[in-house]
From Swiss-Prot:
This is Threonine--tRNA ligase. InterPro entries: aa-tRNA-synt_IIb (IPR002314), aa-tRNA-synth_II (IPR006195), aa-tRNA-synth_II/BPL/LPL (IPR045864), Anticodon-bd (IPR004154), Anticodon-bd_dom_sf (IPR036621), Beta-grasp_dom_sf (IPR012675), TGS (IPR004095), TGS-like (IPR012676). Its EC number is 6.1.1.3. Transmembrane segments: none annotated. One of its GO terms (cellular component) is cytoplasm. Residues 246-537 are annotated as: Catalytic. Catalyzes the attachment of threonine to tRNA(Thr) in a two-step reaction: L-threonine is first activated by ATP to form Thr-AMP and then transferred to the acceptor end of tRNA(Thr). Also edits incorrectly charged L-seryl-tRNA(Thr). The keyword Chaperone does not apply. Residues 1-62 form the TGS domain. Zn(2+) binds at C337, H388, H514. PROSITE patterns: AA_TRNA_LIGASE_II, TGS.
Length: 639
């Protein structure tokens, strides 16, 4: 008998020869139709068909867990591979990984050996995939010596698989299959093809074998897979909506920002985009002031010695930009925290001063490969709304709790009401003592639990210096965006020898808390553009009011209205062009102005305004003071 310990600490006995599926069906029957794989001792993920061979802590993985989701998508990649080789007998498979960012959740790179594949071929491939699903093949696994595997794939002419096997250090490799078809793979996979009911091929592109332009050009087919048609349909709806809302398209239409060939990956903010950027910064700056934060600024270029001391030189080197000053190595900062710690260290500190909260809108630079750049979502220069808090250890939980409240206050201000929260735990490559990591992780959990906030666990996805809370916001079309973080850091205070004098006169190390709410202003603005479809709420809108004249006779009256509104603090544009009013209205609608003031002789004579609100066809007549009062009330009501 073996013993398996569940997450609730209950222990279950398992008979010899039982598979993990047998165990789930007996002990956890409510999960038998959702289970995709199991995770043992927090790291070893195995198929449900594997025989239990040891005592272990066990987690059942479903589609809602990341590892379960990855198992599902990777199995769908195998489904695609089998369908392609059933239809195209000469096709050679290479690799079929799971991805998080791209036009699909998985892809397979395939050498069709001269056959041209286009999206028009997708229906035929999808039909074969559906046939395989309906056949409900059992997914089998076999472990064989490398020599045998090479001989097997040589007979099939699978030259890429032979090359992959040659790079594997182990003397054995695993093969997964359905029916007579099989593929080289580490796994894990779902138990049978019938589980993969809902899928869609989404895109096609070219890709060089091993990303080397001197190698063969392959065909990369992307796809997505879901447990149900409802979830697939929802995803496809999101994709179509996302195309309409693409922040790159809307940003160009509203003249918010651009990217230039002289600086790929570096956004250029135009006047209206700068208004939006400043609105976000000003709001958060005011909220920080209410909560006792002190704003600082640190240099963009700092000595390599600093980055070696902070650990970034070893852990972040490939993402940094370097320069030489006076024959010494320097780097553009990829993060703000080391500079902030130098400011803390510049003075002596007493326990009476702590917690000490520093805030910085810090511009950072990180090298990203050209192929992963994506509008404002993935750039090489961005501004973080960083805060670094230095506190005694006993203040950690209260500070984290306050930051949680602060974070949700900000998100709700922008109209976000649904969230998912995760705790990311210690990665393999990390720094610090085991007891500090355990204490910090437990404190983050307790802080969320006391606020009644449910959370998931992202095993091994914390920063190298400490665990973190990740805040995900759901936008207006149901997509989740990871934005804010709260990170606990015991490493940097130790590395920089930061201390304070406690009440007993002894020097002690503070704990350091890294906090960001937007994450980066650039990315958060991209999210807002797509969330609102460019129709920003009045308080941050760069196009609040457009004044349109019907005839030239009212130009002076329109200018007088313009000046009054500008003096009241609003962003106003005046259109006195000698154009038909219909054309002016259409142009203003495209600019997504919150309000149009359509002024003719009637309004001039009565001293009133004809007001049309964005999204409405009718106009209302208001006094000038009444309109200003309404605008002020609308901004106040935004929270």
């Amino acid at each position: 008998m073996y013993q398996l310990t569940l997450p609730d600490k209950s222990v279950k006995k398992v008979a010899l020869g039982s598979t993990y599926r047998d165990f789930i069906e007996k002990e956890l029957p409510f999960l038998k139709n959702k289970a995709l794989a199991v995770r043992l001792n927090g790291k070893d993920i195995q198929d449900l068909s594997r025989v239990v061979e040891t005592d272990a802590n066990i987690e059942v993985l479903t589609y809602t867990e990341k590892a379960g989701w990855e198992t599902f998508q990777h199995s769908a990649a195998h489904l695609l591979g089998m369908a392609v080789q059933n239809l195209y007998k000469n096709a050679n498979l290479t690799v079929g990984p799971v991805i998080e960012n791209g036009p699909g959740f998985f892809y397979y790179d395939i050498d069709f050996q001269g056959t041209i594949i286009t999206p028009e071929d997708f229906p035929k491939i999808e039909a074969e995939m559906e046939r395989i699903v309906k056949a409900d093949y059992t997914v089998w696994r076999k472990v064989v010596p490398k020599k045998e595997a090479i001989e097997t794939f040589q007979k099939l002419g699978e030259k890429y698989k032979i090359e992959i096997i040659g790079g594997i250090l182990s003397e054995e490799v695993s093969i997964y299959g359905m029916g007579e078809w099989f593929d080289l793979c580490r796994g894990p996979h779902v138990s049978n093809s019938g589980i993969l009911k809902s899928f869609k091929l989404t895109a096609i592109s070219g890709a060089y074998w091993k990303a080397d332009k001197d190698n063969a050009m392959l065909t990369r087919i992307y796809g997505v897979a879901f447990p149900s048609k409802k979830e697939l349909d929802q995803y496809l709806f999101q994709i179509e909506e996302a195309k309409k809302r693409d922040h790159r398209k809307i940003g160009k239409e509203l003249d918010l920002f651009s990217f230039q060939k002289e600086g790929p990956g570096f956004p250029f903010w135009h006047p209206k985009g700068t208004i939006l950027w400043n609105s976000l910064a000003d709001y958060l700056r005011a909220e920080c002031n209410k909560r006792g934060y002190q704003e600082i600024k640190t240099p963009a270029v700092l000595s390599s010695e600093l980055w070696k001391k902070s650990g970034h030189w070893d852990n972040f080197h490939e993402n940094m930009y370097f320069t030489d000053i006076d024959e010494e190595d320097y780097a553009l900062k990829p993060m703000n925290c080391p500079g902030c710690s130098l400011i803390y260290k510049h003075h002596l500190h007493s326990y009476r001063e702590l917690p000490l909260r520093f805030a910085e809108f810090g511009s950072v630079h990180r090298h990203e490969l050209h192929g992963v750049l994506h509008g404002l979502f993935r750039v090489r220069a961005f501004t973080q709304d960083d805060s670094h808090i230095y506190a005694p250890l006993e203040h950690l939980e209260s500070e984290v709790t306050d930051i949680i409240d602060f974070t949700f206050t900000v998100y709700k201000k922008f109209g976000f009401s649904e969230f998912k929260t995760f705790i990311a735990t210690r990665p393999e490559k990390s720094q610090g003592r085991d007891e500090d990591w355990e204490f910090a992780t437990n404190t983050l959990k307790q802080s969320l639990e006391k606020k009644g906030i449910p959370y998931g666990i992202k095993e091994g996805e914390g920063a190298f210096y400490g665990p973190k809370i990740e805040f995900n916001i759901k936008d207006s079309i149901g997509r989740l965006w990871q934005c804010g973080t709260i990170q606990v850091d015991f490493s940097m205070p130790e590395r920089f020898e930061l201390d304070y004098t406690d009440s007993d006169g002894q020097k002690k190390r503070p704990v350091m808390i890294h906090r960001a709410i937007y994450g980066s202003l650039e990315r958060f603005i991209g999210i807002l553009i797509e969330h609102y479809e460019g129709k920003f709420p009045l308080w941050i809108s760069p196009n609040q009011i457009r004044i349109l004249t019907i005839t030239e006779k009212v130009a002076e009256y329109a200018k007088d209205v313009y000046c009054e509104l500008v003096d009241a603090g609003f962003r106003v544009e005046l259109d006195t062009r000698n154009e038909k009013i219909g054309a002016k209205i259409r142009d203003s609608i495209l600019k997504k102005a919150n309000y149009l003031l359509i002024l003719g002789e009637k309004e001039m004579e009565s001293g009133t305004l004809a007001v049309r609100k964005r999204g409405q066809e009718d106009t209302k007549t208001l006094t000038r003071s009444g309109f200003i009062s309404n605008l002020q009330d609308e901004i106040k009501s935004a929270g």
